[in-house]
A protein has these predicted regions:
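Short, glycine/charged-rich beta-strand-loop motifs at protein surfaces that mediate ligand recognition
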Residues: 2-3, 209-210, 242-243
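Loop/helix-junction capping segments adjacent to catalytic residues or to phosphate/diphosphate-binding pockets
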Residues: 6, 10, 191, 216, ...
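Generic structural signal for secondary-structure transition and capping sites
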Residues: 21, 75-78, 173, 177, ...
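C-terminal alpha-helical "lid" subdomain
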Residues: 200, 215-339
């Protein structure tokens, strides 16, 4: 740009920046974020989850509140701006493990086509600062942060590192109020996040509890998880199962259906029918006193306040699968501010 007047050169640079953001290959896609061994950030394109509202088993009022905050702002963006209302928002889903926070998040991500959706789980949460910078370039955007409590007190990436939770709050502050940017957080330990969020109000606008499923929800979950299974259950079979599974999680009920299928296959290698007897045997096994650890792993009887901070992160598997497939992994190295 040698020889150009300063103002003209600045306009040209601004236009190049605009085109770079507008034509960015990541724009409008669902992206799984991970860290590579060299400290860079890997972005993997993923197929959006094909979930519908009927696939989300929550009380109608709870799901309405979640949709209104996440999707309603997207539907009424122009009207909100015209009325002087901000678009940037934070939504926290909290509750015991296994109740459907991740499933609900996947549903929302699938509904927000046209948004750049960046999903951070596990140690990729350490790069929240840099990922937020990318999201601001690719608005409208969603940053989904799964199980924030697991790394809330860890140090972020970069020489001037700070606890990840404070980096997250700074990132939320850094986005302008008119930015159509949704921060979607999930946690099993709301008690760990609440003091910091309360000290800096306005970052999370809505916190929604995803509680243990009640009796009607448990019935819907059994139907949902058994939709591809040849269930041959009487009304009495279903009612007894609902009664005996009081206090269990969605994860527990999903495993119950799987084990019922295994019980049927044990009787006959050709799967023709899963009966009440199969369901009862599977439930007897899951509720057996020797299966206490199994129930804990399925979120049953777990007090979130008793969960370790960070311990599960280092012992557990890698990032969760957010869609049917991921492909085209590319790498982007962010500056020290965010990793």
């Amino acid at each position: 740009m040698a020889g150009l007047p300063v103002d003209r050169a600045q306009r040209l640079l601004a236009e190049l920046d605009r085109l770079r953001a507008e034509l960015n290959v990541y724009r409008g896609h669902l992206l799984d974020v991970s860290l590579d061994p060299m400290g860079g950030v890997a972005l993997a394109f993923a197929d959006p989850p094909g979930l519908t509202r009927d696939d989300v088993v929550l009380p109608a009022a709870v799901l309405d509140r979640i949709e209104r905050h996440a999707l309603g702002v997207a539907d009424h963006r122009a009207a909100l701006l015209a009325a002087g209302q901000h678009l940037k928002r934070g939504l926290l889903l909290y509750g015991p493990p296994g109740t459907g926070k991740t499933h609900t998040t996947r549903y929302l991500l699938g509904q927000m086509s046209g948004y750049t959706r960046l999903v951070l789980t596990g140690r990729s949460l350490l790069a929240v600062g840099g990922v937020t910078d990318l999201a601001r370039d690719l608005l409208p955007a969603v940053i989904a942060l799964e199980d924030v409590d697991l790394v809330a007190e860890e140090r972020s990436l970069g020489p001037a590192s700070s606890p990840v939770l404070f980096d997250l709050l700074d990132a939320m502050d850094g986005a302008g109020p008119d930015a159509d940017l949704l921060f979607l957080l999930t946690t099993n330990r709301a008690d760990l996040l609440e003091p910091a969020l309360a000290a800096r109000p306005g970052r999370v606008d809505v916190a929604v509890e995803i509680a243990l499923p009640d009796a009607p929800a448990r019935e819907r979950l059994l139907t949902l998880y058994g939709q591809n299974v040849p269930l041959a259950l009487t009304e009495q079979d279903v009612n007894l199962a609902i009664e005996r599974t009081d206090g269990t999680t969605a994860s527990f009920l999903k495993e119950l259906i799987r084990r019922s299928v295994l019980e049927s296959l044990h009787d006959d290698p050709v799967l023709t029918a899963v009966t009440g007897a199969h369901l009862a045997r599977a439930l007897d096994d899951l509720l057996d006193s020797a299966q206490g650890v199994t129930r804990t792993l399925l979120g049953v009887g777990v007090d979130p306040a008793d969960l370790p901070v960070g311990g599960l992160l280092h012992a557990g598997p890698g990032p969760r699968a957010w869609a049917g497939s991921s492909h085209r992994v590319t790498r982007r190295r962010f500056g020290s501010s965010g990793g």
